[in-house]
Design a protein with these regions (language model features):
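N-terminal edge beta-strand
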Residues: 1-9
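Aromatic-rich carbohydrate-binding modules that target alpha-glucans
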Residues: 9-59, 69-91
Length: 91
């Protein structure tokens, strides 16, 4: 799931997944962090989910995927679209 908050100069985007599916650490990897694994690792929240928040520029499109333990890449089903290999997010 993706939670968004529009800001005056951009968007605050929170990527949310269940706390234990998939198991192990998960990070969101995309063009906004130069596709660097571990740059934005999802952390547990008190509501039984895990999440990470990033700030992105307004009126932009970003490609991203999730990376879990064991080199398991997967997409966000609630993204704004897909470009074949990646999920897309519009701010």
């Amino acid at each position: 799931m993706i939670e968004r908050k529009q800001l005056k100069d951009g968007a605050q985007v929170t990527f949310v997944l269940p706390a234990d599916v998939p198991p192990g650490p998960v990070s969101v990897v995309g063009d906004f962090n130069q596709w660097k694994p571990g740059a934005h690792t999802l952390e547990p929240r008190s509501d039984g989910t895990r999440a990470v928040t990033v700030r992105l520029p307004a009126k932009s499109v970003h490609a991203f995927r999730y990376l879990a333990a064991g080199d398991y890449w997967f997409d966000e089903h609630h993204a704004d679209g897909h470009d074949g290999a990646n999920s897309l997010l519009h701010t």
